[in-house]
């Protein structure tokens, strides 16, 4: 039996995606609020920096693990304000999260040129060479087979298309590491319990962050999927990093 990590637990490979889906379905209604509380609002600045890596909004963009739609909505609003002709496809394996994203696009009148697809990052239902950009924010560490997802990203991008990933990473400064670990393992699950009633979901969150590859390890994984000009930029001392690469 093929076992992989689900947080600090070992589970059968075939069961991980269902467990991850359950985590996000259980916290979907409080997801945005928890992001604000856990990061003290910093996640909004990280995402703003992330979308600045997409200079050409006259593009077809695939946002994978779109969740509640933060990245896609920022891109859609920016394109509308600039008068750009953007086409956005939001993809997530969790239907509850995608429903929340769709509701937000309607509430903000940003639903033009947006498509929604319930799909796995490991098996994207799109033809080869379809997109100018592939974006994924705080999602790839939840994918059971990250290498397979990276290869799928490479497949669906057009030649010269850009892969961009925002993900929790490894704090670089030694003086900050101990506090960050205490905050992650002691405070975040407690906040999760108070706000969502689901402490276990946020225990999984911090455990999955702890187990995610380092910046340099993930850079190598992206390169091995076929991407060129692969690099990353640390934000907030390495709490998160933006990774990118091109299909050449």
UniProtKB/Swiss-Prot annotation:
It holds the Pfam family Ubie_methyltran. One of its GO terms (biological process) is menaquinone biosynthetic process. Pathway: Quinol/quinone metabolism; menaquinone biosynthesis; menaquinol from 1,4-dihydroxy-2-naphthoate: step 2/2; Cofactor biosynthesis; ubiquinone biosynthesis. S-adenosyl-L-methionine binds at residues 68, 92. One of its GO terms (molecular function) is 2-methoxy-6-polyprenyl-1,4-benzoquinol methyltransferase activity. Its EC number is 2.1.1.163, 2.1.1.201. The keyword Transferase applies. Keywords: Menaquinone biosynthesis, Methyltransferase, S-adenosyl-L-methionine, Transferase, Ubiquinone biosynthesis. It catalyses: a 2-demethylmenaquinol + S-adenosyl-L-methionine = a menaquinol + S-adenosyl-L-homocysteine + H(+); a 2-methoxy-6-(all-trans-polyprenyl)benzene-1,4-diol + S-adenosyl-L-methionine = a 5-methoxy-2-methyl-3-(all-trans-polyprenyl)benzene-1,4-diol + S-adenosyl-L-homocysteine + H(+). HAMAP family: MenG_UbiE_methyltr. PANTHER family: 2-METHOXY-6-POLYPRENYL-1,4-BENZOQUINOL METHYLASE, MITOCHONDRIAL, METHYLTRANSFERASE. Methyltransferase required for the conversion of demethylmenaquinol (DMKH2) to menaquinol (MKH2) and the conversion of 2-polyprenyl-6-methoxy-1,4-benzoquinol (DDMQH2) to 2-polyprenyl-3-methyl-6-methoxy-1,4-benzoquinol (DMQH2). Belongs to the class I-like SAM-binding methyltransferase superfamily. MenG/UbiE family. This is Ubiquinone/menaquinone biosynthesis C-methyltransferase UbiE. It comes from Rickettsia akari (strain Hartford). The lineage of its organism: Bacteria, Pseudomonadati, Pseudomonadota, Alphaproteobacteria, Rickettsiales.
């Amino acid at each position: 039996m093929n076992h992989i990590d689900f947080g600090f637990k070992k589970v059968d490979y075939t069961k991980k995606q269902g467990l991850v889906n359950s985590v996000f379905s259980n916290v979907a209604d409080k997801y945005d609020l928890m992001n604000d509380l856990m990061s003290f609002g910093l996640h909004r600045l990280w995402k703003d920096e992330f979308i600045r890596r997409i200079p050409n909004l006259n593009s077809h963009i695939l946002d994978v693990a779109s969740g509640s739609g933060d990245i896609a909505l920022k891109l859609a609003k920016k394109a509308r304000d600039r008068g750009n002709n953007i086409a956005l496809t939001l993809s997530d394996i969790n239907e509850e999260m995608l429903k929340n994203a769709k509701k937000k696009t309607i509430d903000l009148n940003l639903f033009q040129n947006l498509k929604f697809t319930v799909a796995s990052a490991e098996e994207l239902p799109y033809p080869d060479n379809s997109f100018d950009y592939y974006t994924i924010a705080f999602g790839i560490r939840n994918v059971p087979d990250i290498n397979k997802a990276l290869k799928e990203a490479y497949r669906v991008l057009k030649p010269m298309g850009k892969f961009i990933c925002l993900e929790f990473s490894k704090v670089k400064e030694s003086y900050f590491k101990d506090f960050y670990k205490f905050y992650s393992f002691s405070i975040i699950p407690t906040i999760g319990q108070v706000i969502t009633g689901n402490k276990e979901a946020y225990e999984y969150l911090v455990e999955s962050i702890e187990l995610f590859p380092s910046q340099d390890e993930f850079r190598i994984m992206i390169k091995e999927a076929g991407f060129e000009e692969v690099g990353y930029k640390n934000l907030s001392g390495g709490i998160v990093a933006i990774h990118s690469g091109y299909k050449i």
